[in-house]
């Protein structure tokens, strides 16, 4: 199953002629957040989370509301109105294998991340979830790119030499 990959920048509403993007990269002990205006980095923040706080959550998905509030508090402290952000981009994890590149996050991508279809319970999947929830809340677009489950094998590369047995790719392209 492939997700929608192509989109036009014209589809993404801009505020004051600026294309503002909030990038969300959840990790095991922190959430990295960057704000861009066009191609210029406005700021990058690493929001650390105490282990004692994270251990209170029985499942990675349960951290989503907590991390959402931490991000909103940081944006408020930086004087950034989330409504002025044109697009939310989240690190991808937990979804179907897919080609590298930019992918529009929709309800299907969100649901797949929640389910952890790739077998992952890493906080990376919260990136898609947070981007989608922010996009819904503020009426914007959500994207992800270069999933932790990239598959760009051609049909020939899938052959194993054993009838009915095929290779599949599960490559974290950002770790190459």
Where are these regions (language model features)?
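Acidic, Ala/Val/Gly-enriched low-complexity intrinsically disordered segments
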Residues: 9-12
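Short glycine-rich, Thr/Ser-proximal phosphate-binding strand/loop in the N-terminal lobe
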Residues: 17, 21-62
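N-terminal phosphate-binding loop and adjacent alpha-helix
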Residues: 44-83, 115-120
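ATP-dependent carbohydrate kinase catalytic cores
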Residues: 136-176
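Active-site phosphate/pyrophosphate- and oxyanion-stabilizing loops and adjacent acidic/basic residues
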Residues: 132
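Short beta-strand-loop/turn "lid" adjacent to the catalytic site in phosphate-handling enzymes
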Residues: 75-123, 149-164
């Amino acid at each position: 199953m492939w997700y929608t990959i192509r989109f036009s920048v014209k589809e993404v509403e801009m505020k004051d002629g600026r294309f503002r993007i909030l990038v969300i990269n959840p990790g095991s002990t922190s959430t990295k957040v960057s704000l861009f205006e066009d191609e210029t980095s406005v700021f990058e923040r690493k929001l650390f989370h105490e282990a004692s706080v994270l251990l209170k959550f029985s499942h990675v998905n349960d951290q989503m509301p907590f991390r959402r509030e931490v991000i909103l508090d940081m944006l408020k402290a930086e004087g950034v109105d989330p409504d002025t952000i044109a697009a939310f981009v989240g690190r991808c994890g937990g979804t179907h294998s897919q080609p590298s590149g930019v992918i529009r996050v929709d309800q299907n991508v969100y649901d797949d991340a929640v389910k952890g279809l790739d077998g992952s319970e890493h906080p990376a999947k919260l990136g898609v979830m947070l981007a989608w929830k922010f996009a819904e809340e503020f009426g914007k677009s959500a994207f992800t790119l270069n999933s932790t489950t990239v598959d760009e094998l051609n049909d020939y590369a899938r052959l194993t030499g054993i009838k009915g047995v095929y290779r599949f790719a599960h490559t974290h392209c950002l770790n190459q």
